Regions:
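M16/MPP (pitrilysin/insulinase) zinc-metallopeptidase core fold and M16-derived inactive scaffolds
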Residues: 70-142
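Catalytic zinc-binding patch centered on the HExxH motif and its immediate surroundings
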Residues: 21, 26-39, 61-68, 115-138
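Intrinsically disordered, low-complexity coil segments
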Residues: 9, 111-116, 148-151
Length: 192
């Protein structure tokens, strides 16, 4: 009997395409694209910058913009190599890392608005421009399917703020002489 089962390769073979999470793709003007996969307990976002601005170092007014539009993001916890608080790190951090922190803040705000007493979400932004195209960030969040109802509005809010930040002035916001590392990892967390 066992032998007969093993001879049939299609028996008990799941359709892997049905088990794979759906990738949602978004293009944000000429600024960046997002490929989002929401899993049971986490969300993966691949962010591709569509221009050569890689760092907030090239946006000297970044702290003022955040203070005006989302001051609470400056209080998010940041785990970086130098141990800098986010309100300092934000002056010279990668665009993908900034996106992560803004999204974490909006996730917390939306969860509390929905009725939660507390909210904690963590994120990790990685990049490796030796392996991947320059400007690609891999963002992992502790926001799974149970929070699917707050992810979509948080993404919309994050994209709106990123459009303000990256399109603040019609002049080029980037310097050709950037000193961003070819690969790296940064983590963040927001507790409300």
């Amino acid at each position: 009997m066992n032998q007969a089962l093993s001879l049939n390769p299609n028996l008990f073979q799941p359709n892997w395409k049905l088990l794979q999470p759906e990738v949602q793709k978004y293009f944000v003007e000429n600024l960046f694209s997002l490929a989002i996969i929401q899993k049971q307990t986490r969300t993966q976002i691949t962010m591709d910058l569509l221009y050569n601005q890689l760092s907030t170092k090239e946006i000297p007014f970044i702290t003022d913009l955040l203070q005006e539009n989302l001051p609470s993001v400056l209080r998010t916890t940041c785990y970086n190599d130098l141990g800098l608080p986010f309100h300092v790190e934000v002056r010279n951090t990668e665009i993908g890392h900034l996106f992560e922190h803004i999204l974490l803040e909006y996730l917390c705000q939306n969860k509390i608005r929905k009725g939660a007493k507390r909210a904690t979400f963590a994120g990790r932004t990685k990049w490796n421009w030796v392996r991947d195209p320059m400007g690609r960030f891999h963002i992992h969040l502790t926001c799974g399917r149970r929070d699917a109802d707050i992810l979509s509005p948080a993404l919309e809010q994050t994209v709106s703020l990123m459009k303000i930040i990256l399109g603040y002035d019609s002049k080029p916001l980037f310097l050709l002489n950037t000193t961003t590392a070819q690969n790296g990892l940064k983590n963040g967390e927001r507790r409300c």
